[in-house]
């Protein structure tokens, strides 16, 4: 597959770099991450192995409470500057409702210094938001509040 073709795939849009073991957690049964041989030699875990440091995670969530419960475990098992994507239902989704959107529901991650940096459309039902540790985000001084300036919401 040429580099141009790869960028058209979901994994390409998510900046997947060939990691040999990844997490795809809480995905719908009919969700397909890749077609063909793209993940042929990759171990895809559907739960986080607490003993393994992951470089690439995709976690589907529908409620803020799920973010609150999953975030600490995901961050504990994420390698330094690993790729962490949270997928949430679009407002136009026909498969149910969510209390999450691009701008709301991510406080549990923000409280641990992770902020949404990139967004991609997964399919007609889901969007994905990449979270990154503030220490790796350039020009952070004006974009994000310092820890002691955050609201208690």
Feature map (PLM): residue ranges:
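Flexible, glycine-/basic-rich loop-and-beta segments that form/coincide
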Residues: 10, 135-153
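Conserved class I S-adenosyl-L-methionine
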Residues: 14, 19-27
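Short, charged/polar "capping" segments at the starts of alpha-helices
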Residues: 29-35, 94-96
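Short acidic low-complexity segments
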Residues: 43-54
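A short glycine-rich, Lys/Arg-flanked "PGG" loop and its adjoining helix->strand segment in the class I
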Residues: 71-80
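Conserved beta-strand signature within the Rossmann-like core of class I S-adenosyl-L-methionine
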Residues: 81-90
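Conserved Class I S-adenosyl-L-methionine
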Residues: 99-119
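Conserved beta strand-loop-helix elements of the APE1-like EEP
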Residues: 128-136
């Amino acid at each position: 597959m040429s580099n141009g073709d790869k960028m058209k795939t979901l994994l390409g849009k998510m900046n997947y770099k060939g990691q040999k073991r990844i997490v795809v957690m809480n995905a719908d049964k009919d969700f397909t991450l890749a077609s063909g041989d793209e993940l042929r030699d990759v171990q895809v875990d559907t739960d986080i192995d607490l003993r393994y440091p992951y470089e690439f995670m995709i976690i589907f969530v529908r409620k803020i409470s799920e973010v609150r419960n999953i975030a600490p475990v995901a961050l504990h098992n994420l390698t330094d500057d690993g790729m962490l994507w949270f997928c949430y239902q679009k407002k136009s989704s026909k498969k149910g409702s969510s209390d999450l959107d691009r701008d709301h529901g991510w406080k549990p991650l923000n409280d641990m210094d992770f902020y949404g940096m990139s967004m991609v459309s997964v399919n007609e039902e889901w969007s994905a938001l990449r979270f990154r540790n503030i220490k790796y985000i350039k020009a952070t001084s004006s974009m994000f509040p310092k820890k002691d300036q955050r609201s208690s919401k």
